[in-house]
Amino acid sequence: MLHVNFTEEESLNTQALIVFIDDKLKLDSELINLDQQHHGLISKTIANKLQFTGKYGQIKIIPSVVKSGEVKYLVLAGLGSEEKLTEVKIEELGGKILQNVTNAKIATIGLKIKNRISNFTSSHVASLIASGALLASYRFDKYRTTLKEADKFVVESFEISTDNNAEATKLFEVKKLIAEGVFFTRDISNEPSNIKTPQIYAERIADILEELNVDVSILGEREMKNLGMGALLGVGQGSQNESKLVVMEYQGTNKDAPYIALVGKGVIFDTGGISLKPSNNMHLMRYDMCGSAAVVGTMIAVASQELPVNIVGVVGLVENMPSGNAQRPGDVVTTMSGQTAEVLNTDAEGRLVLADAVWYAQEKFKPKCVIDVATLTGAIVVSLGPTYAGCFSNNDELADKLIKAGEEVNEKLWRMPLHEDYDAMINSDIADMANIGNVPGAAGSSTAAHFIKRFIQEGVEWAHLDIAGVANSNKPSSLGPKGAVGYGVRLLEKFIKENYEQ
């Protein structure tokens, strides 16, 4: 993990110094002094607008002409219009800086920031820049044994001086704890499915959360059978690896205060079962457990901060595999709620896992609200692409709060429709419901949401986040490499902190 330290200006001792310049290209007195120390290098660079214009996100690394001293490079970072800067933009700028200096093989970087930028104090800006750099420093290359040393390069340290280092440190320490939740989510999601079997995944959850005073229970197939979880167990019955239900209970306030329940789909690998998927890109189905990973990452972020809230996380961990024991299209399963479901397509398995998991969470913990997170449907990818996750909810206020939190951390949600017509589409001729709609190709995300909605008890606020399009990316972003994004951790942490702290 990138080492970040807030220190006094005279203690800065780094190979590169970051310089913020907006699109007006005017240097304040501090930058004029720095420019003079470096023989006009900054002013000469910005005078040539072909080299640097100050637009947001532009990074220009220039070697220092001063032979003495530690600073070998100046890193010009464009702010664009200061009036348009947001927390998201500042944080992403930190990520862009880290990525550029990593490519330039610069081991230590420094930043001096004493003045306000737009509406933000220097300590606030510094914490956001450091947070973005930290998130962007993430790597998952432990299985790459032939990497050249040059390709293993990482930035070692980030030294920052502000007008209030104590405040900057306090702000950043919170963001660092959240990043640890994001990194766990990315790590476990990126793991190959042969490495993260349900048992191994469950053990990793227990190992990290029990150190944070979270009670973790792992239910095996015998316990789930006794509870009547026929839907979840049916999905995993074709696999040699036993299905698990992991229950994470965090009490940060009065035990009588209501719980928030976070429920995650954890399909460790999804072949589609007997309704087998095409082989093209099937390897990406290792990411079909990203909803569960987001729930665990959120529990880490909340518990490590010791937030004064009560939260339970429930994740169903299964493998959807074809075999002689696998569930067949046309099978009928009885859920923990007592309702029955006809499995018309074994590749619509996530909603079956969630049906039993959300019911268990409600029966055991009586939560005020339930939020489930799942890479549930390809239809949501068609609808929203890689920009938004879909948000379905039976409560307008809950949906609005989630959407607001998502905007604040750039994990965007788009409200999607629920309607009685969609609910009618999942009626079955031989069971209480079917696991796919009866109009081929129509409203697949909404019918999936309605399936889950049938397991939400009266009076419980509920939201379903379909993250299939945003959970993993085939290209890098400002805050991380391609692969698992860690989507949902920062969104849910922000939502919980803004709405449920006692």
From Swiss-Prot:
Subcellular location: Cytoplasm
Broad EC category: hydrolase
Gene Ontology BP, a term: proteolysis
Positions of Mn(2+) 2 binding: 265, 270, 288, 349
Reactions mediated catalytically: Release of an N-terminal amino acid, Xaa-|-Yaa-, in which Xaa is preferably Leu, but may be other amino acids including Pro although not Arg or Lys, and Yaa may be Pro. Amino acid amides and methyl esters are also readily hydrolyzed, but rates on arylamides are exceedingly low; Release of an N-terminal amino acid, preferentially leucine, but not glutamic or aspartic acids
This protein's GO CC annotations: cytoplasm
Molecular function, one GO term: metalloaminopeptidase activity
UniProt entry keywords in alphabetical sequence: Aminopeptidase, Cytoplasm, Hydrolase, Manganese, Metal-binding, Protease
Entry annotation: catalytic residues: 277, 351
PROSITE patterns: CYTOSOL_AP
Binding residue positions for Mn(2+) 1: 270, 347, 349
Family according to the record: Belongs to the peptidase M17 family.
Function: Presumably involved in the processing and regular turnover of intracellular proteins. Catalyzes the removal of unsubstituted N-terminal amino acids from various peptides.
PANTHER family for the chain: CYTOSOL AMINOPEPTIDASE, LEUCINE AMINOPEPTIDASE-RELATED
Name under which the protein is recorded: Probable cytosol aminopeptidase
Gene from which this protein is expressed: pepA
